[in-house]
Amino acid sequence: MSSFSNVGFVPHDGENEEDAINLAPKSSESFPAEDSIFADGSPRHRTLFDSKKRFKLRPPLLASTPRVICRFQQASSGSSAPYFTREPTFQPIQEFIEMSEHFHDITENSQGYRFLNTKEPFSRHHSALHHPRLSFDVLPKVIDFSRRWIGRARDTLYRLSVAYSGQEELGIERARDELDDRREHINLSEIFGGSHSQENSCSSGGVFNLNFDKSIEDRQLSFENIDLDSTSPQSTNDVIWLRDMTTVSTISEPILHPSSKISFTSSSPSPQRNPKNEAQKNSSSKREETSMFRSDPMKLYQMILVKEAAFECVAEIGKHGNVQFVDLNAKMSLYSRTFVKQMRRCEEMERKLRFLEKQVITCKPGLDPKSIDYTDLSAPTQAEMIQLEHKLDQLEREFLDLNNNDYALRKNLNSSKEFLQVMRLVDEFFQVHKEEEAKARFERSATTDDIEMFSKSFGFGGLPSSNEMPLTPLLGSDDNAWFVAGVLPLDKKESFERVLWRACRRTAFVRTSDASFTVNDPVTLEPLQKCVFIVFFKGESLRLIVEKVCDGFNATQYPCPKSSKDRKMKMSETEGRMNDLTVVIDTTQTHRYTILKDMSFEIPIWLKNIQIQKSVFAVMNMFTVDTNGFLAGECWIPAAEEDDVRQALHDGFKASGTEVEPILNELWTNAPPPTFHRTNKFTNVFQSIVDSYGVSQYCEVNPAPYTIITFPFLFAVMFGDAAHGAILLLAALFFIRNERKIESKKIRDEIFNTFYGGRYIMMLMGIFSIYTGFLYNDAFAKSFNVFGSGWSNSYNETQLDWWIARSYRKHREYSLELVPEKSFDIEKTYPFGVDPIWNIADNRLSFLNSMKMKASVIIGITQMTFGVFLSVLNHIHFKSYIDIISNFIPQVIFLSCIFIYLCIQIIVKWIFFSVNAENVFGFEYPGSHCAPSLLIGLINMFMFKKRNEGYLNENGEVYSNCHLGYWYPNQRLVETILISISLACIPIMLFGKPLWVRFVTSKRHKLQENKSLKSLRRNGTTVSAPTSPVVDAGPPRFEDAELLLADELDIGEDIHHSLSDIFVHQAIHTIEFVLGCVSHTASYLRLWALSLAHAQLSEVMWHMVLIQGIHTVDHIENETIAMCLKPVVACVAFFIFASLSLSILIMMEGLSAFLHALRLHWVEFQSKFYLGTGHPFHAFYLKESLENAQLITEETDRLADISSGQHLHI
């Protein structure tokens, strides 16, 4: 491909046009190579530009002239290299010149344009500066222009990429208003209309002529006489980028949205762009930049989609889950958005599908719901959804009819069954009265005594037994309504009798069946126990009372024939009707089951399509919609995923079959980007621990990578038992080994999922616990003598016998002290961990407590210091150098002068002070009783208390408080200096940053005032401020980064408006750090406390449960019985020991150590550098939507299993 390395400037007024004409080379030999290097910008921009960066300008861009006129021609002497010449008909445009009073201000004026190009850099040895044809009067202009242009275009050049492979790209960019969040109404349809018209005008060869017509009032840009030479290889697919154009005039006068892109395509053939290949080529290099130590770089993009292709493009993006869309309609109601009708249709389809799904789950025999296939996330077409909607509507109506018919049939069946039971019981009641004459004779033969007995029994107000109550007074009545029969629930039998008896004032008699029968509820199919009742009464008033009581108890009354013959006929008819109803119900259920069985395989597919449709339309409701149907939205995309997103948009564009390709342009914004950390199944649990405290701010140091090591280690320090750690490790390995089986079962138990989700952190906690258990030489409260103890018994047999005899005589135990000079061999020091001799020593707690306490202090101070050093990474990243000077350095010095000094004392005491009398640091050390007390010494250090030097006085006698004196030379002077330095660091931390901010702010204001005065003096006139808002062209400038992101990182809001806020914040931060160093150091002593508690509980479990349980049979005198019981007792004791160890030592103690380790990381460690006030990156991912839908299905299935046999009816 030919290149252009020479530049021809159209001169301004007062310049010599002949000089410009002479710039054109006369032959191809005069052309330099295609590469050229430019300097690092003007002095005013050198802070923004790295001199080592190189840029290739193809074709050369002329930003210092009001009108750029370029002609593609062939060089003389047969050279094929094209070059630029001056267009002879040049008319300068006064409006563009008036836009800026001075050309040096063009690149700084918010109303101006910048000419950008994103090609590869020229090489240094072919610089255009070495061209012999360039005269010295033009050369400074070229250099000045290049410096100014490159300095302003630095960040933009990094983000622009060639739109089509192997083709040149000319970019014209305007600044975006970063402070104005208003989104103006745009007519996106005219963008594409303008592009088509320009595309047609670029199809012919000739002159490429750009005419800029710019005024402050109109702010218009026009393209005139656009022609491309057909012989030029650069005449294809040139791309022009425009940003923050409020009004742009082209042939069709389109109104452009910020960051819109218009493609001008000529008729000459060109290689097609393949976004998929580009994504594969660039994604690997971009992904290497991502790291877990900081959040992924995020970019805000504007996405413009034609309405016909919007669904396919958004659905294709949802397959990857790497885009977070911004809701541009947050102030609008959900019911007033564009695609609310589509959302309602999806919700209605989902409702119908859930209804059908419940029919499948609750049918008999049961059908297991199928799972959704997450491998294929392809979106359904609109035709498929219309067909699905019709099918669901048809199935819903069909099943509603089936349910209603089934309800009616079952209700009739229950009624027939109840009626049959009533007639049977009534027939049994009246079996002894088959003939009417027999009944009359029975009434007349009743004696007076019987009647008196009957009346007396009711005269006392008692309630006789219903089944023993005589019926004689009512049987001879001529009234037809003398009894009522029916059924009622069995559990209401006794209360029904009592209420009816009292309501009728003891004048009605109730008989109920002793045996009950079962009917199924027609709605829920639950079995119901019912019984038959008969109420005997006389009179219309009693009949009304009986009916009201029956209604109150939900009792059903049935008309029963008086004669036995009629009753038997009715029973025969009822039995036949019941058989017919049973056949119809069985046939209906068979048909119903067949439909549901076939439908159970289709429901997951339907549910997936509905959820995809619903999720996509929910995202599309976040877009703003033009009146002509174009959608514009904003989204956050990880920088490493940009190519994948563009490829997804390209695939969606192809699937839609439209002609307008989607637009994806980067935007500048002051809004804080979301935080996105890439994790896998191993690191996810550690990132979740950090995010539970607070999501890190954008690009803030992420504590999760360090937590992977420090969290299990601190846990193991408190849980230091090798045996318990091994059990924990085996449990974690079981979960890891059976991951696929456990996930396939889809267990929804919350407690189980908590342990399963933390399987990898359990594995690390188990490994570190085994390590610390070996350090402590502790396993089930027992030590292992692997390498041989360095201690030995220095007592002979005679001395031991004497001590034993004395212990026997005194009836007490004596402890023998092993003298180190005689009993310890320094050459046989235990190589790893604690010597096993301490496990049987009486003073083991004194030794281990001192060791663990000091080790906890060292570990805590080390982690806090590490956290302070991590804070400097944030300061460097955000270029907050004032924080390094006023916060980081004083904090490190403060920690070093007090707490690191304490750690050094601990280590020195361990190394140099022993039980032997020797000379230590120039002082005669008498022995272990004079070992320096570090805690009291630290207190005396702050109190500046006068102490003795050394351990012996002038007479060689040991001081009474020798452990409180100075134990190394010049200790008082050293400690005084350390205290003074640490106290001097406090005002630096308190006032350093606020005073610096005040100084820089006042200096900046003065510089701005001086610059404004100079500009007014140079122009000689007073220039009124433009009506349009002044914006910065490009990304935010960070000359004074310590006043921008650094403060935002510390406070989380803009603090420049009030200096008092800075003082208050810095005071809080300083007090928190100074007091926190003391309290946090004491907080790390929990490492020692929990380790001690765990060791003591282990010892209690071993000796008091296992050992003592095994020896309980030792007191049995019969050896045979003792030998038989000992294995049983040992098994029982071991079972109790194992149960208590698992429940208390591993579960409870493990949970306690976990929570304490969590607190040490959240408060003591992360408070030194971590704010955690960001917001997470929530990407639009179709798989997550489908998983939520699957959870609803599984929950429905679980509830159906709980209430097995229920039948849904709507």
Curated annotation (Swiss-Prot):
Biased composition, class Low complexity, residue ranges: 259-271
Chain intervals for the UniProt region annotation (Disordered): 259-292
Claim: Ion transport is one of the keywords in the record: yes
GO CC terms: plasma membrane; proton-transporting V-type ATPase, V0 domain; vacuolar proton-transporting V-type ATPase complex
Coiled coil feature spans: 339-405
Comp. bias regions, Basic and acidic residues: 275-291
Chief localization: membrane
Annotated glycosylation sites: N1010, N1019, N1118
Membrane topology listed for this record: Multi-pass membrane protein
GO process annotations (BP): vacuolar acidification
Disruption phenotype: RNAi-mediated knockdown does not affect embryonic or larval development.
Extracellular compartment spans: 737-760, 877-892, 998-1127
UniProt keyword annotation of Cell membrane present: no
Keyword terms: Coiled coil, Glycoprotein, Ion transport, Membrane, Transmembrane, Transmembrane helix, Transport
Chain ranges passing through the membrane: 716-736, 761-781, 856-876, 893-913, 977-997, 1128-1148
Xref: InterPro entries: V-ATPase_116kDa_su
Quaternary structure and partners: V-ATPase is a heteromultimeric enzyme made up of two complexes: the ATP-hydrolytic V1 complex and the proton translocation V0 complex. The V1 complex consists of three catalytic AB heterodimers that form a heterohexamer, three peripheral stalks each consisting of EG heterodimers, one central rotor including subunits D and F, and the regulatory subunits C and H. The proton translocation complex V0 consists of the proton transport subunit a, a ring of proteolipid subunits c9c'', rotary subunit d, subunits e and f, and the accessory subunits vah-19/Ac45 and vah-20/PRR.
Protein family according to the UniProt entry: Belongs to the V-ATPase 116 kDa subunit family.
Role this protein plays: Subunit of the V0 complex of vacuolar(H+)-ATPase (V-ATPase), a multisubunit enzyme composed of a peripheral complex (V1) that hydrolyzes ATP and a membrane integral complex (V0) that translocates protons. V-ATPase is responsible for acidifying and maintaining the pH of intracellular compartments and in some cell types, is targeted to the plasma membrane, where it is responsible for acidifying the extracellular environment.
PANTHER family (alphabetical): V-TYPE PROTON ATPASE 116 KDA SUBUNIT A 4 (PTHR11629:SF56), VACUOLAR PROTON ATPASES (PTHR11629)
The protein, known as: V-type proton ATPase 116 kDa subunit a 4
